[in-house]
Amino acid sequence: VRVTVMDDLTDSGRGVNLVAGEEKVLNGDEAYVYIRKRETETFGSADERLRRQEQFITSFITTLNTSSIERESQAVAIYNAVSDYLVTDVDFETLVATLLGYKYTEDNMYTVPGETVQGSEFEEFYPDEDALEDLIIQMFYKEVE
């Protein structure tokens, strides 16, 4: 998955050194570190990781939709690679057709509104209840005329 690296990230155990601003195709350990790593002693690192995850997912979906997934062998390979992590009653053909028709952008991604504060031991997230209710209504309800 191609991304513009958002944060300097190093994991010597995995042999990964990513530099902020670098345009990079992430595979294997680099992708793992990019979406999982956070500095627990740095306030806000969970939010930074979430931004990277959103970026990675968006790029991943875009790559799937613009790649050679139309070739059935590619779709089968992708399905087989993730099938151990899927629980679904949707058959393979329907799943592929749905994915091919899905247009995914960062505009389709929602984050619970709220505030992260430093607690006595850990970061604590407090949702904005009113804004969350508005988001739920916007996403799941349609006004009836």
Regions inferred by a protein language model and the residue ranges of each:
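Flexible, polar/acidic helix-loop-strand segments at domain edges
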Residues: 1-73
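Generic alpha-helix detector with strongest preference for long hydrophobic helices that associate
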Residues: 16, 37-41, 59, 63, ...
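C-terminal solvent-exposed extensions
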Residues: 21-22, 26-27, 81, 85-145
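Solvent-exposed, polar/charged alpha-helical surfaces in well-ordered, non-transmembrane soluble domains
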Residues: 33, 55-62, 76-80, 84, ...
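Short flexible/disordered coil segments
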Residues: 43-49, 68-77, 128-145
